[in-house]
């Protein structure tokens, strides 16, 4: 009987231990800590260049250098075009090599999914995706020009991106669940619209001139006192309307276009995040190119996870753990203050070394 009881307890304890090994975020007073192997983990990290993990040779050459630099974490791109070079056929060779080299050099890994968007553009999407622009439509400018930016309003775009992402996440879970080398995932990279503040495709226009979702209006009403000042001012400018189109609720300008586009991007990312959590529940984040140097939406990547759009992103993408700023401009202290919030832990993936 005692042996039987021990066996039953052992069966229950094993899944619990495996679960406890997964990284997670934990609130400690006013601070949020990244927990790895059940202990607070301070990331001393560096991010590889855009194509620095695109060959086995480069990975093997770079990773030992990172250890010698004193890093404990490396942020590494994972490329959709190299993961799914042929539609439906997946190659995880580079992912496996990253994990193997990280373990060999005592490093943790934060993977960056270069999927439908990288720095706004769809440059790391597979060639079969790029060539079939009818099935996988592009975003359009106001003047009617198609961009090399996949449309976030296309279900086909989402299905293709999310299928590859899901297969990749399943692979990571299968090869790394016991070791716990991979500690976070960034979904897409510096998502945002360029040239114009929003997509002007027919699908986008249809939703832009439709009513603002009532649930989002309800969120604004419930959180009126804590809204970002810019979001509050936009809503107030139209008399705090409780229903109407995007322009009727927020006004007819480029910043309303940006709010609308942020809603679309955040919903897309939320669907990706839900898939990720259902497969391998580790911390997830998105990064943002800054709205700096007096530029307007579209001059900077419009509608990304920016501080003034935090209400849109937090509501529409609740499965994202934090919005992360990429800091290449002067005014470090001011930028950090925009993102170091009670509801947004500060993590800076990219920064210019002055």
Over which residues does each language-model region extend?
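N-terminal carbohydrate-binding accessory modules
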Residues: 18-72
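Short, acidic/polar
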Residues: 52-68, 301-316, 331-335
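Polysaccharide-binding and catalytic clefts of secreted carbohydrate-active enzymes
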Residues: 135-310
């Amino acid at each position: 009987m005692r042996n039987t009881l021990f066996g039953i307890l052992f069966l229950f304890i094993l899944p619990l231990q495996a679960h406890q090994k997964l990284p997670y975020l934990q609130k400690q007073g006013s601070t949020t800590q990244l927990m790895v192997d059940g202990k607070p983990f301070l990331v001393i990290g560096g991010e590889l260049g855009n194509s620095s993990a695109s060959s086995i040779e480069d990975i093997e050459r770079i990773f030992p250098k990172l250890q010698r630099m004193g890093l404990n974490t490396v942020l590494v791109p994972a490329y959709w075009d190299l993961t799914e070079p042929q539609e439906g056929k997946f190659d995880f060779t580079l992912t496996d090599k990253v994990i193997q080299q990280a373990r060999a050099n005592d490093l943790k890994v934060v993977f960056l999914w270069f999927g439908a968007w990288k720095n706004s553009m769809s440059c790391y999407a597979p060639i079969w995706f790029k060539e079939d622009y009818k099935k996988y439509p592009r975003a359009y400018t106001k003047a009617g020009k198609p961009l090399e930016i996949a449309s976030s309003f296309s279900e086909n775009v989402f299905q293709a991106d999310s299928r590859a992402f899901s297969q990749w996440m399943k692979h990571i879970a299968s090869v790394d669940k016991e070791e716990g080398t991979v500690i976070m995932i960034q979904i897409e990279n510096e998502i945002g619209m360029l040239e114009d503040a929003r997509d002007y495709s027919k699908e986008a226009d249809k939703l832009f001139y439709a009513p603002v979702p009532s649930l989002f209006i309800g969120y604004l009403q419930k959180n009126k006192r804590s809204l970002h000042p810019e979001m509050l001012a936009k809503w107030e400018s139209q008399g705090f309307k409780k229903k109407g189109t995007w322009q009727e609720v927020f006004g007819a300008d480029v910043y309303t276009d940006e709010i609308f586009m942020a809603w679309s991007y955040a919903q897309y990312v939320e669907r990706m995040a839900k898939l990720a959590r259902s497969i391998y529940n580790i911390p997830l984040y998105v990064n943002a190119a800054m709205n700096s140097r007096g530029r307007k939406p579209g001059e900077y990547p419009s509608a990304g996870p920016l501080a003034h759009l935090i209400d849109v992103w937090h509501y529409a993408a609740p499965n994202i753990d934090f919005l992360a700023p990429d800091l290449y401009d002067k005014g470090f202290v001011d930028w950090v203050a925009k993102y170091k919030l009670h509801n947004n832990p500060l993590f800076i993936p990219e920064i210019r070394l002055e």
